């Protein structure tokens, strides 16, 4: 490193004086985050490791107040980790809904970490979209991924990664009263949501269990490696309909809730929107899903040439699953054409006129939600194995949504659906 590079510092954007003692990790640790990770991380313990002088930095705390108070961007934790790992160029990646705060966060990190920030503006639909590959190609040595859980383990990424869940404070009292008003005392409710509302789900669980006025059993389901009470649009727990009276999703929109409804069509589903505080009964047309997806599989059975798509949006694609499917498709006598796409659109696939059917290893919801819009069958890995008679057929009572389960297709494995009770 030249003398000029050492002396070059980002322009300061906040008024105040920084202490030299805050510029680096006092322990001088050079542990690489991507090479070693403890099996379980105690969040409270991690917070306690942040130096008190950083937590009490008046200038930093004043800058943090520029961000909405009900959104926890964990700025202290981020600054501490960037300093600890002596990162020089840091990529920050967040969903479009949070990009409005990206420049404020960028300014804060540049000033208090003395590093360069690169804002990644491409779409980030979920945790599967973490784009450490692109960040590394931009010479970044650290990436902060916002608003999604640790779906992609930090010990396999190409650069150091910090996941910030961006937990959101909501009116928990209103949520509790809403559930008490709408469900009989003693009801067994599977409550889940996106990672932003996970603390609220666990907090209300204890309060409702201890309520003498109107006790409810809140059961945050878990499909590993997701956290208890967490659900994704492609991954949710298969629940026992004899043990659960209802499902309640905390969050806006239906995308993630639909995963649980598809996986558990016989359990009533409800949604609590924490932004407008509305509580609604939600339904999903499972019969239509079965008809549309079964039709796509039937059409694909006669295919001779199959386009096998590897999703290249972040880490959506899985090479092991692609290779496994390629082997099986070739063994069935089909010609396989491998295609790499960051995003999959009907117009794009229509250009491959001589391909009879497509199999996409990216996001199963592309096929489930939008498969009808493609002029050729677009199958998921699971549906492809059904077509090849290597997996059980779905029906109106069961369609698996376990893509990122520890043994799921999203992890390069082949799940066993034979032991699922219907």
UniProtKB/Swiss-Prot annotation:
- Asked if the keyword Cytoplasm belongs to this entry, the reply reads yes
Q: How is the cofactor bound?
A: Binds 1 [4Fe-4S] cluster per subunit. The cluster is coordinated with 3 cysteines and an exchangeable S-adenosyl-L-methionine.
| Cofactor(s) this protein requires | [4Fe-4S] cluster
Cellular component GO terms, alphabetical: 2-(3-amino-3-carboxypropyl)histidine synthase complex; cytoplasm
Q: What processes does the entry annotate via GO biological process terms?
A: protein histidyl modification to diphthamide
Q: What is its EC number?
A: 2.5.1.108
Give binding positions for [4Fe-4S] cluster. 128, 234, 363
For molecular function, the Gene Ontology terms on record are: 2-(3-amino-3-carboxypropyl)histidine synthase activity; 4 iron, 4 sulfur cluster binding; metal ion binding
Q: Which UniProt keywords apply?
A: Cytoplasm, Iron, Iron-sulfur, Metal-binding, S-adenosyl-L-methionine, Transferase
First-level EC class:
transferase
Localization, UniProt? Cytoplasm
Q: Does the keyword S-adenosyl-L-methionine apply?
A: yes
- Which reaction equation describes what this protein catalyses? L-histidyl-[translation elongation factor 2] + S-adenosyl-L-methionine = 2-[(3S)-amino-3-carboxypropyl]-L-histidyl-[translation elongation factor 2] + S-methyl-5'-thioadenosine + H(+)
Which pathway is recorded for this entry? Protein modification; peptidyl-diphthamide biosynthesis
Q: Which Gene3D superfamilies does the annotation name?
A: Diphthamide synthesis DPH1/DPH2 domain 1, Diphthamide synthesis DPH1/DPH2 domain 2, Diphthamide synthesis DPH1/DPH2 domain 3
Q: What does this protein do?
A: Catalyzes the first step of diphthamide biosynthesis, a post-translational modification of histidine which occurs in elongation factor 2. DPH1 and DPH2 transfer a 3-amino-3-carboxypropyl (ACP) group from S-adenosyl-L-methionine (SAM) to a histidine residue, the reaction is assisted by a reduction system comprising DPH3 and a NADH-dependent reductase, predominantly CBR1.
What is known about its subunit structure?
Answer: Component of the 2-(3-amino-3-carboxypropyl)histidine synthase complex composed of DPH1, DPH2, DPH3 and a NADH-dependent reductase, predominantly CBR1.
Q: Which family does it belong to?
A: Belongs to the DPH1/DPH2 family. DPH1 subfamily.
What is this protein's record name?
A: 2-(3-amino-3-carboxypropyl)histidine synthase subunit 1
């Amino acid at each position: 490193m030249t003398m000029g590079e050492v002396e070059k510092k980002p322009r300061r954007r906040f008024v105040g004086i920084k202490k030299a003692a805050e510029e680096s990790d006092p322990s001088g640790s050079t542990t690489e985050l991507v090479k070693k990770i403890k099996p379980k991380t105690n969040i409270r313990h991690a917070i306690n490791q942040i130096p008190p002088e950083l937590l009490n930095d008046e200038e930093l705390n004043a800058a943090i107040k520029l961000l909405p108070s009900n959104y926890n961007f964990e700025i202290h934790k981020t600054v501490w980790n960037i300093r600890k790992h002596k990162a020089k160029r840091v990529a920050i990646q967040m969903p479009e809904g949070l990009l409005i705060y990206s420049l404020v966060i960028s300014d804060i990190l540049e000033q208090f970490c003395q590093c360069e920030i690169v804002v990644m503006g491409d779409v980030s639909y979920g945790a599967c979209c973490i784009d450490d590959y692109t960040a590394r190609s931009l010479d970044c040595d650290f990436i902060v991924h916002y608003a999604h859980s640790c779906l992609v383990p930090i010990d396999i990424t190409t650069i150091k990664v910090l996941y910030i869940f961006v937990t959101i404070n909501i009116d928990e009292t209103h949520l509790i009263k809403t559930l008490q008003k709408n469900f009989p005392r003693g009801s067994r409710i599977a409550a889940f949501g996106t990672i932003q509302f996970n603390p609220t789900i666990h907090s209300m669980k204890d309060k409702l269990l201890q309520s003498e006025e109107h006790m409810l059993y809140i059961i945050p389901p878990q499909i590993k490696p997701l956290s208890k009470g967490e659900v994704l649009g492609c991954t949710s727990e298969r629940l026992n309909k004899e043990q659960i009276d209802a499902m309640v999703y905390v969050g806006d929109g239906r995308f993630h809730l639909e995963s649980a409804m598809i996986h558990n069509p016989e359990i009533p589903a409800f949604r609590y929107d924490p932004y407008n505080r509305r509580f609604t009964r939600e339904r999903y047309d499972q019969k239509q899903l079965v008809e549309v997806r079964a039709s796509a599989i039937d059409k694909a059975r006669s295919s001779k040439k199959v386009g096998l798509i590897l999703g290249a949006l972040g880490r959506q694609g899985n090479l092991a699953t692609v290779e496994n499917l390629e082997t099986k498709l070739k063994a069935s006598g089909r010609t396989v054409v491998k295609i790499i796409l960051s995003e999959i659109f009907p117009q794009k696939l229509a250009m491959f006129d001589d391909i009879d059917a497509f199999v996409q290893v990216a996001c199963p919801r592309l096929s489930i939600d939008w498969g009808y819009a493609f002029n050729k069958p677009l199958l998921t890995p699971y549906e492809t194995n059904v077509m090849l008679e290597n997996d059980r057929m779905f029906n109106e009572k069961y369609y698996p949504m376990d893509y990122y389960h520890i043994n799921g297709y999203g992890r390069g494995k082949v799940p066993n659906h034979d032991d699922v009770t219907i």
